[in-house]
Every structure is written in C-alpha cells, then in structure tokens.
Amino acid sequence: MDTQDLLQNQNVLVLGLAKSGYAAASILHEKGVKVVVNDQLPFEENEPARILAEKGVEVVCGSHPTELFDLHSIDILIKNPGIRYENVMVEEALKRGIPVWTEVELAYHLTDAPFIGITGSNGKTTTTTLVYEMLKADSKKALVAGNIGTAASEVANQASGDEWIVTELSSFQLMGTYQFRPKIGLLLNVFDAHLDYHHSRKNYELAKQQVYRNQSETDVAVVNLDDETVVRLAECSKAEKVYFSVRRTLERGACVKDGAIMFNGEPVMPLEDVVLPGEHNLENILAALCIVKTAGVSDAAVRKVLTSFTGVKHRMQYVATIKNRLFYNDSKATNILATKKALSAFQKPVILLAGGLDRGNEFDELKPHMSFVKAVITFGETAPKFEKLAEEMGIQQVKRVDNVEQAATAAFSLSDEGDVILLSPACASWDQYKTFEERGDMFVNAVHMLK
C-alpha cells in the first residue's frame, strides 16, 4: 500500500517513544510525512528523542501538551500500545474525532506483503515462533514481527510483497487497528486479562476480535473449536474457517488421533516425537499447523521443527539443574492461565515464585493446580495475595522477598533434591521491571550465580 497516498497532506502525532513509536516516527519522517513526536520522558534523559531530533523530527518531551493538536493540525495519532486511553493526549484525539492508531495499523499500510496475525490470551509467542520456524524450514520467505520483537512497522517497511510477515499481536496493539487485515488470522484463546486496561471483558474481546474483523472471503481464519468465545468472535470474519481441537477428532483441520498429529484426516507425525514440553503446548502446535498448512508448508518441514523445537525464552524455559534442583523460567506467565498451565506441567514437588503488578485479580483459580506446590516465594505488589493463597492451601513454607533475584536464592535454600523451582509470576512485571524479559533475565542470572 502507498503510505504517501494514504498520509498525503496528513499531520501525524506519534505518542510514546518505546521501540514501536521510534520506528513509526523514523519511517514516517523518512517518507516525507509531517510528523511530531510527544514523549513523557524529559529530553535530556531520552536518547530516542535526541536521535529523532538530530534527524529533523520535531520532538516535545517532558509533558503532554494538548496544544499540539491545534499547533500542528493533527489528523492521526499513533500511540505506543502500552499508553492507556485515559492519557490526556489520547482523550483529546478521540474527543476531536481523530483516529488513534497503533503502529500495527501503520505497518499494514506500508507493504503489500501478506500478514499472519496471531493473538490470544496465552501461547502467542510460542505459536508465532513455531509458524515462523516451520515456514523457514520449508524455504518460504518469512519475517517475524510485533509483540515478539521487532516493531511491525519496521519489518513491514523492509518486506517484499512475497514475504509472510508473521506477527504476534497483543490486545493493546489490536485495539488501535482500523483496516489491518491479516491474510491468515488466529485467535488462540480468550480469558480475563488486561481488564485494568480494557475495563471490561467485552472491550477485551472486541480488541482480540480485530484479528478477524476485516478479513475477506480470500483470507483464512484459524479457529480454536475448544474455546466457545473464540468460535463466537470468529463469526464476524468473512474468511474461510480452518479449525483445530485438542479435545475432539476432526475430519477437517488439526487434531490428535490415535497418538498422531492429524491435518485434514491425514497423519502428520507421531505425537511422541514432539519435543516441546507441556500439554498446553499442544494447542499452540495444532494452531501453528493450521496456519502453515494453509500457507503450503510440507509435512516434512513441520516434522523437522517439532522434533527439535524445545520452546522460547521466558516461556517454560529450562534454565539449569543445580544439586538436582531443576530451575524453570516462565517469566512470560503474566496472567493466571499461564501459571495454571505451567503448574500442570509438573508431577513433582514445586517451589513457586510468583508476584508482580496488582491488576485487581484474585488467584483462587490456581488452587486446583497447586497440589504439588510445597513452598511459595512471593514478591511485588501482589505478594500479600499469594501469601493468603498459600495459607488457604495449607502451604507452610512461604516467604516474601524484594525481587526475583532474592526469590531464586530463597527458593534454593528451601529446596530438596528433585524439586522444581519455577518462576511463573501470574502477574505483569511493570511494578518492578520494565518487561517480563528483564524479569526473566534477572532470574536466570541469579540462578547461574547459585552454581
């Protein structure tokens, strides 16, 4: 798509200079689009702002002056996905009827390359990685983008028309899309998450539904038959539906039958040959299979990946065995469902390290999955809630610490040979760490210090 035609004579305000905002501002400036950047961080502390200013981009830092809308006759606002809609600049834009994009929408307008859009409450990163690796294993041209790493607009700006752009999409990113239309769209699952941001389950579902909403008859919607909400939300899509199910046998789509992974009634490979740990990953595998078979990937390429792929960093990542204690980093478990799945993967004593940003959740849903938990080490804003949970479960060994580094040390001191020490916080990291990656890296480093 021709960005200059779309944004001709348009004035764009980029709000927030994390990686997506920086990428959007840089690309628009390079294409000659009139752009101004606004970021809360003071200019002298803001390296991305200084780089943009050196390029000739107008940058306003340290506050959010609504005067910018009139001063620059703003037509479109592109915001960092993490910035809430209660932000004064976002509220002002909406009040004026100005579209509020995330850079995923911009990415869509930068290229004719087909998008594979992958979203869901859990499993996005693993599924995105599986799809990308399977495409590459079959010598398909593919790029990976979005919530998983490189900003979508940066990838799209470099993509050729015959490359698949495999894009991990959060609800925050999707909420700021208008015309974004993935050639293949997937909603893995839906449950209560990010309600502090979206304010209601309905709003959260509407954001997730954007992965399907703009699809046409020539597109494909991959649908989880085991999730009633996903099935309902997919009804808006005009695309061909391709289904997968962990629980039932399907003649069309992906499932498991007689110990084999199946697609359209034909065996792809024995389930026992899959090396990716955890039953919860079967959902991700079947979803990825639907996507790549739609894209023409061979069974041989699927088998090549599934017999070697052991998982992604920060998602049930094996870290080390120290004195016969097994350490796992599941820092990407930023919600309750992810931690439920992590706990269900082990049939031996577990020391759970949990806590983080308090979004108002209670954690009673974890109780049925805590039968193997022998101790809880907790930290962050939700520490009191996890202490209460442990008490209600009759867990005697409970300790509150300041951070994940201390949690690793405390867990090791409480552990016995054969124990699993599992960081699976069930909470976002933002009360103490910039990202779940930073939290996970701090934990991994602390574990290695125990050797």
UniProtKB/Swiss-Prot annotation:
Can you cite a GO biological process for this protein? regulation of cell shape
The reaction(s) annotated as catalysed by this protein in its Swiss-Prot or TrEMBL entry are: UDP-N-acetyl-alpha-D-muramoyl-L-alanine + D-glutamate + ATP = UDP-N-acetyl-alpha-D-muramoyl-L-alanyl-D-glutamate + ADP + phosphate + H(+)
* UniProt keyword terms in alphabetical order: ATP-binding, Cell cycle, Cell division, Cell shape, Cell wall biogenesis/degradation, Cytoplasm, Ligase, Nucleotide-binding, Peptidoglycan synthesis
The protein's predominant localisation is: cytoplasm
**Which Pfam family is an annotated match for this chain, by its short name?**
Mur_ligase_C
Which residues are listed for ATP binding in this entry? G120, S121, N122, G123, K124, T125, T126
The broad enzyme category this protein falls into is ligase
The GO cellular component terms are: cytoplasm
**Compartment annotation:** Cytoplasm
An annotated Gene Ontology molecular function:
ATP binding
InterPro entries xrefs = Mur-like_cat_sf, Mur_ligase_C, Mur_ligase_C_dom_sf, Mur_ligase_cen, MurD
Q: In which pathway does it act?
A: Cell wall biogenesis; peptidoglycan biosynthesis
Q: What is its EC number?
A: 6.3.2.9
Write down the superkingdom of origin. Bacteria
Protein family: Belongs to the MurCDEF family.
Reported function: Cell wall formation. Catalyzes the addition of glutamate to the nucleotide precursor UDP-N-acetylmuramoyl-L-alanine (UMA).
Designated name of the protein: UDP-N-acetylmuramoylalanine--D-glutamate ligase
Name of the coding gene: murD
